[in-house]
């Protein structure tokens, strides 16, 4: 009988993803990556998602104070092999060091869109004061 596959990440995937995120953050904070684009930019790593076999780590990053993120993301992907090698001492329990992939994190942009939508006059009108007396009488 085949095991049912779940789309939710396992506890192990979440734990390893958080360890990789912390290690990458330290590598970037210490300035170990020698690239003008990366050195002059504050980069926030919001999440690292691991593949089920733990061989691929996709890091979602947000370069702060930069309008166009594509150059920074490209620079991070160019230095992915170097950073993978620097993960070794911090992730000694791993049998294989995961391949690193960097992607632009759009969750903050989505948050801003939802916030703007909730603050729009049309939605505010619908969310206006409710009749609490009607609720209490029923």
Swiss-Prot record:
Annotated segments matching region Disordered: 119-138
Keywords per UniProt: Cytoplasm, Ribosome biogenesis
GO cellular component, one term: cytosol
Entry keyword annotation includes Repeat: no
Gene3D superfamilies: 3.30.300.20
Molecular function per GO: ribosomal small subunit binding
Presence of the UniProt keyword Cytoplasm in the record: yes
Subcellular location: Cytoplasm
GO BP annotations, alphabetical order: maturation of SSU-rRNA
Function of the protein: One of several proteins that assist in the late maturation steps of the functional core of the 30S ribosomal subunit. Associates with free 30S ribosomal subunits (but not with 30S subunits that are part of 70S ribosomes or polysomes). Required for efficient processing of 16S rRNA. May interact with the 5'-terminal helix region of 16S rRNA.
NCBIfam families noted in UniProt: PRK00521.2-5, rbfA
Family affiliation: Belongs to the RbfA family.
HAMAP family in the cross-refs: RbfA
Quaternary state and interactors: Monomer. Binds 30S ribosomal subunits, but not 50S ribosomal subunits or 70S ribosomes.
Protein name: Ribosome-binding factor A
Annotated organism of origin: Agrobacterium fabrum (strain C58 / ATCC 33970) (Agrobacterium tumefaciens (strain C58))
Lineage per the UniProt record: Bacteria, Pseudomonadati, Pseudomonadota, Alphaproteobacteria, Hyphomicrobiales
């Amino acid at each position: 009988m085949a095991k049912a596959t779940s789309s939710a990440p396992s506890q192990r995937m979440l734990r390893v993803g958080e360890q990789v995120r912390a290690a990458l953050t330290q590598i970037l904070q210490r300035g170990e990556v020698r690239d003008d684009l990366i050195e002059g930019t504050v980069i926030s790593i919001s999440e690292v998602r691991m593949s089920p076999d733990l061989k691929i780590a996709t890091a979602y990053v947000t370069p702060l104070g930069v309008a166009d993120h594509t150059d920074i993301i490209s620079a991070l992907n160019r230095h992915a092999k170097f950073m993978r090698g620097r993960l070794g001492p911090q992730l000694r329990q791993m049998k294989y060091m995961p391949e690193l992939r960097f992607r632009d994190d759009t969750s903050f942009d989505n948050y801003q869109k939802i916030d703007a939508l909730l603050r729009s006059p049309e939605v505010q009108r619908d969310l206006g004061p409710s009749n609490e007396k009607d609720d209490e009488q029923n």
